[in-house]
Amino acid sequence: MLRFPSYTTKFLVVYLDRLQLFSMVLKIGDKAPEFTLKDSFDNEISLSDFKGKKVIIYFYPKDNTPGCTKEACNFKENWDIFQKNNIIVLGISKDNSASHQKFIEKFDLPFILLTDPLPCQVAAKYDSYGLKKFMGKEYMGMIRNTFLIDSEGNIEKIYSKVKAAIMADHIINDLRLS
């Protein structure tokens, strides 16, 4: 693990936090930022690949962690409903393709996981990478947010400060899906 002197870490956190001041704040009705990322098999996947379909993009911190596993499994439990309603589910984290493959295999996840490596440029475009606090420490990390993109490529709904274990249920209730 790479270690930096504390003054370097503080500088990086302050510098990256200032960069957030210049990030675009997305809102409902905005065009969803286009992206191309690699999936668990190193295939390039673009948002535009799903033009004409609704897409759920959920950003999560890390594969195989308690909250992220609950969130992924909640999407898996509701997979049939999303399929029946022609909705694509994309999970995005900074984990690499090999980590995603293991996570998918371990929990038999039926949807696509994409890797957004540091500096997490796609997550930053979606206001989903920034300063976090945990146990009194500040660090830069993936922020758990979910976006519903309509069939025209516009942001239909934004879910921030989500409860990981019931995120998919929440979307299904909002859209009145069955």
Q: For each predicted feature, which ranges?
A:
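Chalcogenol-based redox active-site neighborhoods
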Residues: 20-178
